[in-house]
């Protein structure tokens, strides 16, 4: 994240608007991408209503299907979510967002008018001219949250929500483990309570603990189109890359993950334990996975 104060100072120094800086931030973010399969580095920079800028990169997981990847635009939106940003005004990207990402960003309130900044040809050296388009131009006749929920009062992606969850009785027996694991469970429950799951009513949270004891937390983030949905493990991986620089082209960095704690609802229509186990077995085979049940508060 680049603070609003720093963005404002940079813009003032150069006589630019904050939005004008986004393509430069994209080029810097692009260098940090982790694309071991495609070798195609993608960066994104999203401008929040607060004035802060949130960076994103594409992350590909070696040995796993392509649809296990994290897109740069998703990364930037999740980073904004984790920082408590409540709205995005603009996003710049290395290239025009794919359809997957256009659909994912459509979960934001006012998404149709959010400005998307994309390259539009060279103007000399490494500099490029840019197009600025509202998302609705890139996603005409869109399918979005209201098409499934029919309720404009429901909080959308980035907006505050609390899912009213608690641990299911007996899900954490007394003396069940080390204090670190109990702390991870509490954080995972908090993530599940903040999860964005308006379509399946299956909120979930997950915590990764690395070899330094650092906690990386994630929550499920759904899409009305279903497939662009991010699992809680994927959003936790975003946190791990963003805060600890985890992940590399060879996949060795992921082996720093030592444990994962997943909190999801008993009998939920959508479950994440199987997917999390598959991914962790591939990228962090020594990591343990603990699944804890939660339930709605009566």
Annotate the PLM regions.
Residues 1-298:
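Zinc-dependent deaminase catalytic domain
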């Amino acid at each position: 994240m680049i603070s609003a104060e720093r963005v404002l100072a940079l813009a003032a120094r150069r006589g630019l608007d904050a939005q004008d800086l986004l393509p430069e931030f994209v080029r810097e973010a692009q260098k940090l991408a982790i694309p071991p399969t495609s070798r195609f580095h993608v960066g994104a920079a999203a401008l929040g209503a607060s004035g802060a800028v949130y960076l994103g990169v594409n992350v590909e997981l070696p040995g796993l299907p392509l649809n296990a990847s994290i897109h740069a635009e998703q990364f930037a939106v999740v980073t904004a979510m984790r920082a408590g940003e409540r709205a995005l005004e603009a996003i710049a990207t290395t290239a025009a967002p794919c359809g997957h990402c256009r659909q994912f960003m459509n979960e934001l309130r006012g998404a149709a008018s959010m400005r998307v900044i994309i390259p539009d040809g060279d103007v000399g050296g490494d500099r490029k001219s840019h197009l600025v388009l509202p998302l609705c131009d890139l996603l005409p006749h869109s399918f979005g949250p209201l098409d499934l929920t029919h309720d404009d009062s429901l909080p959308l992606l980035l907006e505050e929500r609390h899912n009213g969850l608690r641990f299911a009785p007996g899900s954490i027996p007394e003396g069940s483990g080390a204090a670190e694991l109990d702390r991870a469970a509490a954080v995972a429950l908090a993530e599940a309570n903040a999860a964005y799951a308006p379509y399946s009513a299956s909120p979930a949270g997950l915590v990764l603990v690395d070899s330094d004891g650092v906690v990386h937390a994630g929550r499920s983030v759904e899409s009305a189109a279903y497939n662009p949905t991010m699992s809680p493990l994927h959003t936790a991986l975003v946190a791990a890359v963003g805060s600890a620089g985890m992940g590399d082209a060879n996949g060795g960095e992921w082996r720093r993950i030592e444990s994962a704690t997943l909190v999801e609802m008993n009998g939920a229509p959508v479950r994440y334990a199987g997917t999390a186990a598959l991914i962790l077995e591939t990228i962090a085979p020594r990591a343990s996975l603990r699944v804890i049940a939660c339930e709605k508060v009566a």
